[in-house]
C-alpha cells in the first residue's frame, strides 16, 4: 500500500468527507513556491476525494483557467514577488472572494492578526497537523457553498 492509500484510510477513519458544490466540483487551489509542500498538500486533498491543484506562484494561479472554479485557496505567506496576503488582496480587488487558508513556515502574531482581519478563514503555522489543514479546508469549502 502506498502513501496515498495510507492517507485515504486514516482520513476515512477520522470522518473527513469530500465537499462538493451543487452541479460542480470546486477546486482547492494550493499556492506555494515550495513544490514539495504544494504537491504533498495536493496529494492529501485528492486522497479524500477533493479536486486539488498546486501552483508555484500567485501569478501562475491568477492566470489559471481554474481560478473561476476555485472554492478554497490554501496559500503560503512567504513567497517571492507576491506573498499570500498580497494574493488574497489581489483576488478581493478582482471581486473573487475565495475562502482562504494561509500557511506559513515563519509564524508571527502580526501576520496572523493581519490575515484574520483581512478575512482569511484559517492561519496555520508549518509544520501543521494534516487534520488541522483538512478541518480548515472543510470550513472554507462550506463557506464557499454559502455564497
Where do the model's predicted regions map?
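Alpha4 helix (beta4-alpha4-beta5 surface) of REC/receiver domains from two-component response regulators
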Residues: 86, 107-122
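Two-component/phosphorelay signaling modules centered on CheY-like receiver
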Residues: 35-53
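Acidic, metal-coordinating helix/loop segments flanking the phosphotransfer/catalytic sites
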Residues: 54-72
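The C-terminal output helix
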Residues: 138-147
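Receiver (REC) domain active-site loop signature in two-component systems and cognate sites
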Residues: 79
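C-terminal output helix
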Residues: 110, 128-137
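Acidic catalytic/metal-coordinating carboxylates
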Residues: 56-57, 83-87
